[in-house]
Amino acid sequence: MLENIRDAVRKFLTRSTPYEKAVDEFIKELQKSLISSDVNVKLVFSLTAKIKERLNKEKPPSVLERKEWFISIVYDELSKLFGGDKEPNVNPTKLPFIIMLVGVQGSGKTTTAGKLAYFYKRRGYKVGLVAADVYRPAAYDQLLQLGNQIGVPVYGEPNNQNAIEIAKKGVDTFVKNKMDIIIVDTAGRHGYGEETKLLEEMKEIYEALKPDDVILVIDASIGQKAYDLASRFHQASPIGSIIITKMDGTAKGGGALSAVAATGATIKFIGTGEKIDELEIFNAKRYVSRILGMGDIESILEKVKGLEEYEKIQKKMEDVMEGKGKLTLRDVYAQIMALRKMGPLSKVLQHIPGLGVMLPTPSEDQLKLGEEKIRRWLAALNSMTYKELENPSIIDKSRMRRIAEGSGLEVEDVRELLEWYNNMNKLLKMVKRRRGSIDKLFGGKIG
């Protein structure tokens, strides 16, 4: 059902419906789609309330149309719903690195063990699998088959019913064989609703193995029921993370993801299909981009990214005005690149000083002149060394000639850029702490 949101985004951005009406219709469709995906109703209405609150309190930056700005807010708040900026660390912190997988029966735990082994093997690690699920007769055979498929050794004792003993012996064997990563597939004999027994077993094996990571495997089809299981697991195992499987085969994936994210637990991977390589590192923003339709929102996100980068440079300039540091040509390059991401050249040029296009409505000739000057400056900057970008004072006539030749420009073009840069630094020192000076300097505030 989350695919409906993608259609809603496309309609919202392309139809000529009045803005306020279009916003109301979109929010209703968003609520409907999320609830249909088994996202908790309270979470849904909290999300849309935050979106409306931001619409009322914030003003759109000039580089975004109102509809684009609205979608950027939806993107931001949906990303928070599914975990925000939390970036899972999938790299082992030491070698050997022991991973213990736990999960209820039917969650796809054993298949995930194989996928995880393949993931790390492709990254150049020596991986071993331990079959310690003694309650499901086919578990060992399944893991052995997966291991053979991907060329990863599997340790198991089909006639031994002591899971802890198998786990310890398997880990010891692979440590002696100098394996980098050891993945232990534990018992999954309890169904949903029997989390207490599952967690008790997890603790017993954990105490015996002292693994470096404990990963809970959850089937996406349980939707928002994942909250209770993930919450109890997160409390019982502070080092634990979570893998959500079968995201491709259920409409409740959004419910499971949002439920787990609400607990504060880290979602490390999601399973996106049956194939051995269909396990991907979970990134909330990338997931939301898919929901909203990457092609439809890519240009919006690019503008927002440009604005964020510009604001970083603006902060640097404010520091320079207060006598902290100096603006470098690397900063100038970053500033121009950030502004270019923000949209039409007519808007970009109005925010760059010294290009002769500071009028509210530059003429076509002025725009062409400014565009050509930006092109030449970027070519010159791209031909400079790291030291030259960081310390332009070392650029003498000989270096100017080299930069000009490397960029296909005249020496005068390079000299013009350096003169503009020097004048910029002088001006920044002159205005110092005067509030608003930086906005005047750059032709008006962007954000």
Swiss-Prot record:
It holds the Pfam family SRP_SPB. InterPro entries: AAA+_ATPase (IPR003593), P-loop_NTPase (IPR027417), Signal_recog_part_SRP54_M_sf (IPR036891), Signal_recog_particl_SRP54_hlx (IPR013822), Signal_recog_particle_SRP54_M (IPR004125), SRP/SRP_N (IPR036225), SRP54 (IPR022941), SRP54_GTPase_dom (IPR000897). It is found in: Cytoplasm. It comes from the Archaea. SUPFAM superfamilies: Domain of the SRP/SRP receptor G-proteins (SSF47364), P-loop containing nucleoside triphosphate hydrolases (SSF52540), Signal peptide-binding domain (SSF47446). Composed of three domains: the N-terminal N domain, which is responsible for interactions with the ribosome, the central G domain, which binds GTP, and the C-terminal M domain, which binds the RNA and the signal sequence of the RNC. One of its GO terms (cellular component) is signal recognition particle. The keyword Membrane does not apply. This is Signal recognition particle 54 kDa protein. One of its GO terms (molecular function) is GTP binding. GTP binds at residues 103-110, 185-189, 245-248. Belongs to the GTP-binding SRP family. SRP54 subfamily.
